[in-house]
Amino acid sequence: KMVYDMFIAYHFSPDVASLLTKLTTYKGHVPQGAPTSTYIANLVFTKTGNELAQLAKEYNITFTSFVDDLTFSSCCDFHFLVPTIIDIITRNGFIISHQKTFYQSHCPSITGVICYNNRLSVPIYFMKELEDAQSLSPKQHQGKIRYKEKVDRISAAKAKNLL
C-alpha cells in the first residue's frame, strides 16, 4: 500500500502505479537485496524524511537517514523531542523497532567514531591496537594511522567551523 501510494503521489496513473508496485514488491513488501529496494524505500520515506528534517532544522539537530537507519545528533539535549519524532514516524505508517532505538547522551559512537565535547576521536581499543604495532602487518598499521589522522582532521575542521 505504501509503495502504491508513493507512485500515486508522484502522479502515476492508478494502472501504472499498480504495475510498478507489483514489479518492485514481493508478497506486499519491498524485497531485501533487490536492486530497486533501496530506491523504493527512500522514495516511500521521502515525505516522512522531509518532516523529520524540518523538525531537526527547527531545533538545530543533525538528521541523517540511510534506508531505515535514522540518526539524530546534537550537542544539546533533545530528549523532549523523541515522542514527536516517534509520532511523525508512526503517523506516516512506519513501525518503530524499539530494540534498535536508543537515546545516547554521553560519548555516542557513530560508525565506530566517538563523539565527545563536540570532537571526534577513535575509541580506546583502536588506540591500543595502534600502539601494539607488533600484532599488525605494516600495511594494517599504516592504514590505522591514516584512519586516525583522517578522524583527527575532520574533528579539527569541525572545531574551526564552530569558532
Which residue ranges define each predicted feature?
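Right-hand nucleic-acid polymerase module
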Residues: 1-34, 43-54, 75-163
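Catalytic palm active-site di-aspartate
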Residues: 33, 37, 58-74
